[in-house]
Amino acid sequence: MNKTIAVIGAGLSGIAAVKQLTDGGHQVTCFEKAESFGGVFADKKIYDDLHLTISNYFMAYSDYVPNHQKLKFWSKKEYINYLGEYIERFDIAKHIHYDHEVCCVQKQGDKWLVTYKNADTEQTKEFDMVAVCSGHFQKPKLPDLPGLDMYQGNIEHSNDYRDKHNYAGKRVLCVGLGESSADITSEISQVARKCILSLRRYPAVAPRYMAFQEDPYFTIDTSWLTSRIVNKLPHRYHGGITKGIFNKYVTSRNDHVRIRGEWLKKSGPSHHQAVTKNERLFRPIADGKVTPNIGGIERFEKNAVVFKDGTREEIDAVVFCTGYQLSFPFLDVSIANMRDLYKQMFIPEMGHSLSFIGFVRPQQGGIPVIAEMQCRYLSKLASGEAQLPTLSEMHDVIKYDTKHWQTEYKITPHVASLVNYCHYMDSVAKLVGCMPQIPSLFKDPMLRVKLLHNPQFAAQYRLDGPNNMTHTAREFLLSFPNISSWPRIIHFEVALAAQKLLSRLRLDGLREISK
């Protein structure tokens, strides 16, 4: 049963939506308000020095893995080139309407009316379904701080940052730390008279490449930290794995590595919080070009800032790297928290006719592959090959998932869309029917090692199920080097077997008690 589907946005999630929904035989129209695809990466105003903090194998879709390339972190230009190749390879361009801004989306009976604007013309078109792929980065979030309205210096959000030379010779305060903030603060420190970084707490910051490893395959997102087996084991194993690394950090002779290690220790367990995957900031901190102030801002004055520790600094400019807030101006639906949605995709009362794609932030791994998995599920729902649970069941799942993720990431509860990449991907893959069948060590030992002990690449979900690419996926997975030594593999296999045995014994014990 084919559907007419409107996709709003031709960024990473929108491209995935067009591809997966057309694969399902649906008639797809994608509206993009900009003149090109790629979302934030296509924005000419975004600073040119931007490099992705997720490696190319996790930022690529599962049906077009760039295995002809070495593992690397793409620049903005390189990633746009990949997306362009993807669009051309799968003939996606004919579905995208550029310079078409969606103004209003309204439900009328069992249809959706989408009103869009192109140049000076406004039109309305009817669809069976709407997939919102507009992304997180729509409405900059500015903190409400005492005295900010009285401050007379320049105020800018990272969304508007373009050129470090605008801050040459100035005293600059940067507020907040994420991937872009690490880049922006580092750049400004090169030309500023003084650069201060204000943070409320010590954040967990990870390097793109794992320290003390010569193997270029050993990046933060292609380490055993993103393997299926590590994420099947209790958190005490995570702590044991990372403790040795932290100890190496804090005893390093390199000041920037040592400082990062000290921050990591003070930030708390990394598996319980959002992690900034950009270590660039620590070199200017070590060199004295960036002065961190941990604790937060008390107030602003006419030409100064006062921190909660009592320190007062005169400043000429402020750059807020404080993220974005959800914004859907074309919808009359209010969503305060994506965790209120089933799988962070569906408003239960509206069914699958309205979906939100790509509004999940994985602690590790990339948003594009999560968006792709969501769209594979959406395509099955649209075709009638799958059905959403009942209303009460969806609300039960929402309640359970919300509690689970809030407990999992209790240190950074403000990052309300944060999930464990491995667990979330598996949960949706089960709904799609594309969970990989993991063989025993005796049947297919090499594939088992790649599926359990190597990174949980999206290609794993192309081995089985609908729209599988068994040969291509298997070839890629087997070609990737083992990231764990055989002693570590055996150790984890024994630990997993012991965990399964204990679970079985507990279950048997409960059955005996209930008799």
Swiss-Prot record:
Activity is abolished in the absence of either bromide or NADPH, while a partial reduction in activity is observed upon omission of FAD. Activity does not require the addition of a flavin reductase to regenerate FADH(2) in situ. InterPro entries: FAD/NAD-bd_sf, Flavin_mOase, Flavin_mOase-like, FMO-like. Transmembrane segments: none annotated. Disruption phenotype: Deletion of the gene abolishes the production of bromophenol-containing species. Keywords: FAD, Flavoprotein, NADP, Oxidoreductase. Its cofactor is FAD. Brominase involved in the biosynthesis of polybrominated aromatic organic compounds. Catalyzes the bromination of 4-hydroxybenzoate (4-HBA) to 3-bromo-4-hydroxybenzoate, followed by bromination and decarboxylation of 3-bromo-4-hydroxybenzoate to 2,4-dibromophenol. Can also use 3,4-dihydroxybenzoate, with lower efficiency, forming 3-bromo-4,5-dihydroxybenzoate and 3,5-dibromobenzene-1,2-diol. Can utilize iodide in vivo leading to the formation of iodophenols, but cannot use chloride. This is 4-hydroxybenzoate brominase (decarboxylating).
